[in-house]
Structure formats: C-alpha cells, structure tokens
C-alpha cells in the first residue's frame, strides 16, 4: 500500500464507474487525492477527438458542484474525510500541475469512457 494515491477526471457527473475507480485506487493507498479536471468551464479547450466534450451542454456542473458530488459519494461509500482530498487539476496546463498534486503521489488510471 502506498502512502499517497491520485486519480483525476472531469466528473461531469460523478457516476458509479467513477466511484468504483476511486474506491479501487483508495484500496491501494492510505490517502487519496482526487483531481477534478477542467475546473473552470469557461476555459474548456476544444478536443479534436471529441468536440462535444468541450461544449457547455457536456459540462453542466461547476467545480464546486463536482467537488461536493465527489466528497459526498466518497463519504457515503464509507471513506473517512481525513483519508481523501479533492483539488482542482487543470490538466490542460501540465506545467503547473505540481502545484496541485505532490510529485510523490502514485497515479492510478483507468480507461473506460465513450470518447475514445
């Protein structure tokens, strides 16, 4: 088990597969950091692979709403509040990501989305 784990996603809506991803990662670490990508909907960058992903209709929730969805889902799943953190994760700006997640965190990934 690692000390610090990390996952990230848009979580435009935090659904059951996202929760499963978070719980599987949490089982591998003492503390989990959850990064919410595209924290500022106004700065969404058009994605060539799926242009709809950057449209306002595909991003109905604010960072604050997504933060609360993630927090409440993890608490409801039985994860103590002191065992996870939630942070913005502006993935479109890789040069500043170290400001949001420690470089010592182990990143956990999954691939299961409809966009490719």
Short names for language-model regions:
Residues 1-116:
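Nucleotidyltransferase catalytic core that binds NTPs
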């Amino acid at each position: 088990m690692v000390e610090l784990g990390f996952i990230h996603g848009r979580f435009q809506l935090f659904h059951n597969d996202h929760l499963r991803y978070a719980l599987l990662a949490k089982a591998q670490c003492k503390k989990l950091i959850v990064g919410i990508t595209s924290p500022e909907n106004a700065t969404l960058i058009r994605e060539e692979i799926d242009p709809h992903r950057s449209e306002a209709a595909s991003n109905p929730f604010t960072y604050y709403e997504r933060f609360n969805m993630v927090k409440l889902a993890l608490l409801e799943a039985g994860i103590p509040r002191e065992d996870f953190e939630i942070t913005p994760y502006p993935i479109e700006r890789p040069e500043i990501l170290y400001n949001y997640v420690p470089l010592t965190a182990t990143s956990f990934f999954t691939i299961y989305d409809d966009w490719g």
